[in-house]
A protein has these predicted regions:
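Conserved AdoMet
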Residues: 2-125
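Class I S-adenosyl-L-methionine-dependent methyltransferase module
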Residues: 118-165
């Protein structure tokens, strides 16, 4: 009897992925890496294959796709709503106040040097749920010694689900 994947271009090693609901080949992983890099500039390490499988397996279930190839074809057809969910699935939302503590004294020193010269705009490009921009705001208050500093902070994140929180 022929295997159900015979003739589908599924590598034998991928077929033997014991305990997995979906076949996930090295070619599928490379395709995911290429798509997420081209769409969002996210560079996935080759060591992230298991993480990618677990996060995208949920997307396959929710979109009723039987294979990663079918799911990736959906993206390639330009389904913008699914692209958003794809990106949200593959971003990591590690966040905390003053998460990279060595950056904040440098920011405070820089702010003190330019204090009074003009208004200051700060862009926090990976804001997650907000702890990073709040840490920046606390650093601004500490550097200027008041709450009326001429500073505006814009916070953004690729993951739209964390921005909604």
């Amino acid at each position: 009897m022929l295997d159900k994947n015979f003739g589908r271009g599924v590598a034998p090693a991928a077929q033997a992925s014991a305990g997995r609901e979906f076949v996930f080949t090295a070619a599928d992983f490379e395709r995911v890496r290429k798509l997420i890099y081209e769409y969002a500039g996210i560079s996935l390490s080759p060591t992230k294959q298991d993480m990618v499988y677990s996060r995208l397996a949920r997307r396959l279930r929710e979109t009723h796709k039987q294979t990663f190839g079918d799911y990736l074809a959906l993206l390639e057809r330009g389904d913008l709503g699914e692209w958003e969910k794809f990106v949200n699935s593959l971003t990591t939302n590690l966040t905390s106040f003053f998460r990279e503590p060595h950056h904040f004294p440098i920011l405070a020193d820089h702010l003190k040097k330019i204090q009074g010269k003009s208004s200051i705009k700060i862009w926090c490009s990976a804001a997650s749920t907000g702890e990073e921009p709040y840490s920046i705001a606390m650093t601004v208050v500490e550097a200027f010694g008041n709450f009326n500093a001429p500073v505006s902070i814009v916070a953004t994140d690729l993951d739209t689900s964390v921005l909604a929180t």
